[in-house]
Amino acid sequence: VRYLFVHQNFPGQFLHFVRHLHEQGGHEIVFISEANAGEIPGVRRAIYRVPRLPSSSTHQHLREFEYGLLRAEAVATAAKTLKGLGYVPDIIIGHHGWGELLNLVDVFPGCPILGYFEFFYHTDRNDVGFDPEFPPGPDLAAAVRVKNAINLQALSLPNGYGQTPTQFQKSTYPGWAQDRISLLREGVNLELCQPDAQARRRNLVINGVKISPRDALVTYVARNLEPYRGFHSVMRALPRILTERQDAQVILVGGDQVSYGAPPPDRGSWKDIMLKELEGKLDLSRVHFVGKVAYDDFRSLLKRSDAHLYLTYPFVASWSLREAMATGCPIIGSDTAPVSEFITDGVTGRLVPFLEPDRIAEVVLELLEDRKQARRLGQGARGYAEAELSLQDYLERYDRLVEQVVSRHSC
């Protein structure tokens, strides 16, 4: 099969599948992306460059869409070059979030496009208006509607097909669109992410922070420390945890930028805001902000964790949740739809109200005290991962989906 992948940040969500195709052999794989240092054996890369940023005169709500159209044009130009060199794919696979796929129907008419649909925005549900501490501004509804412009264009493409990794994400799309989107649950490397019974008997050092076997380790991981991922609720739970467990150590992984939602006021960071709010209430000698960590350190942290916190608004679940389950962490997750799709309370973890720090602290303390329950939940999480999140099963399902799509078309 001749594959054309497109993702501005090579290889994006497609790393495992591209490697799998190379190992299968017999495929021709080309990947259009912006320039970066990434490299995968057997993959030819074609680089595109966006000629300019959105105009400052463009309406602020439309700038993201304009940037998507600029990307679409640049990707189409790269695709025309490939076509001129004789390359015509059997299938195009990419992520619809940045608009890159929109013009490829004009370059390769009849070629199926299997696009990754991540999230459809709504003005009255899911993440918008979820947290009363941050009520929607007067202009937010208009901005949210426009954020779906690329989504809607993508859903109208001829020969277009969709994939999405969770039922929750699929449910965000309009009913008329869901029939075009296949549920393809993403897998985890179960060998790389697996429990280590000896981890709690060794010292752990993460970015200079040392955790001994005597410590009760509470962990929290996010790309960035921000409200969308429950950072404020976690921080407000810490005073009680640290007071009632003098052996507790807390490691928080994540940067100080903003991945989702509004930036903090005064150009500060949410970490600074929460530290100021909780000044005098935290034993900061036992609260460790380690920033972003290497993947091996991340895995070591999960293997050692005595209680792992994962909270999110009703939005896209992080990869780290899947990896924590595969590692057999005792997980305390927010009782929000993207998390409850993975975590069954009392079976594969514990669910807590996102907005109730005292309840979060209570359940963390319960798991730190009741190690038998914590072990049972960790085993349940690992069992779920083995049954539902196997990387090999995911790749086999991906193969079947591609086969179904390609069989319906001829480029």
Predicted regions and their residues:
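Conserved acidic donor-binding segment of nucleotide-sugar-dependent glycosyltransferases
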Residues: 345-346, 350-357, 366-371
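A short, well-ordered alpha-helix in the C-terminal region of glycosyltransferases
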Residues: 359, 366, 373-388, 394-400
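A short, active-site helix/loop in glycosyltransferases that binds the activated sugar's phosphate group
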Residues: 142-203, 268-269, 273, 398
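Nucleotide-activated donor-binding/catalytic signature segment of Leloir-type glycosyltransferases, i.e.
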Residues: 258, 262-292
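Aromatic "clamp/platform" in nucleotide-sugar-dependent glycosyltransferases that forms part
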Residues: 313
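Conserved donor-binding/catalytic core segment of Leloir-type glycosyltransferases
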Residues: 204-229, 235-240, 250-253
